[in-house]
Amino acid sequence: SVQSVIAADTGHINCHEAASVENTNHKIQTIPNTDGKITATQIDACAGAYYEENEPEYYTEPKMVYLSFPTEQGTLYSLEELKAIREVCDKYGMYLFVDGARLGYGLGAVENDISVEDFAALTDVFYFGGTKCGALFGEAVVITSNDLKRRFKAFMKQNGAVLAKGWLLGLQFYTLLENDLYFEITKKADVLAMKIRDAFAKKGI
């Protein structure tokens, strides 16, 4: 493939996935992070180098932007930042993917101003992390882009991502998302994490 994904240099897919993206014949184009985040301006410059170049055959085509929420450094994107990044994605016809392995903790943070509905409206793919948010295993992927929905299950099958007992995975999320249990669990964890942070701060650590 000649397509690539734009991500922060600290992005999980760039550092902790044993070159899984590259193993599918795609390239990761990294951008220097600031506290784990990248900006719409940076993404615009990176994508523009291809889409506005007279000789694009010499480059990979940026087709997706990868964000983590929260980031690998525990920081959060604001709604304003997410909207700005969405605008750049629309400008160049790129997909926006949000890694939600710790989504619940980000949503429950006091300073957060992004809702699940915002993610659904502004991203092409995001997911509810389960493994790190109270489930035994697995993640619940939400695909909002009709382009990406087509044949997605076939791609899962081709890449060994279909579980024979997959309903057990779904049952976890059925329970976690019922009556907002998922958000209760993660918000409680946020409160406790802030207590630990405050204790360190009092000790000057």
Residue ranges and their predicted role:
Residues 1-205:
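Conserved PLP-enzyme active-site core in the AAT-like
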